[in-house]
């Protein structure tokens, strides 16, 4: 009995270490959704419609953007020395074919997750990396936003390969801030989700699930 008890204690400790090395960002519940910071993009005609649901893998956020652009933000401190890897599970059901995403007229993404570092007193001074599920570009493509060089669009998934399929991707945020912004960032200040179609005037449907940071 003592041996069995010790085994259970060891399993519990190891499980605790595993969870300690993961930082979950969103629960995707009705209660959480009501508390998130909603920001409509200036000039957009409509807000993106966000709702929560669940499947066999847990809760998810569903986004419907019909000529719309608004994001859901959350202030959160992430220690990038301990957990530098962002993990995202997402699915694009309806994408945005034919647009040029690195131009102002086509700068829409069916799915994007921003990681944000405050580098000044105003929102405009912040630096961001915009991890996107592209409708037209290949995985690995990256470019500055056509609206500001302080935000970099980096393609982690594409509907050219995975339309209407759940995809799990990851990226080293600490390394990416150094690569794209030449910044040594030890701590993130916030994270945001957005599905937007205000430039193309099209409709996108996307699902987000299980967004967290990990050690590897």
Can you say where each PLM-predicted feature lies in the sequence?
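Extracellular beta-strand ligand-recognition surfaces/modules
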Residues: 108-113, 149-150, 155-159, 163-203
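Extracellular carbohydrate-recognition regions
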Residues: 20-43
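Solvent-exposed strand-to-loop "edge" motifs in beta-rich extracellular domains
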Residues: 89-95, 118-120, 174
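Short carbohydrate-recognition loop motifs
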Residues: 50-71
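Extracellular/lumenal carbohydrate-interaction signature centered on repeated Trp-anchored short motifs
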Residues: 75-86, 160-163, 184
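Extracellular beta-strand elements of beta-rich domains used
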Residues: 28, 191, 209-213
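Bacterial N-terminal signal peptides
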Residues: 6-15
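Extracellular/luminal beta-rich ligand-recognition
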Residues: 106-151
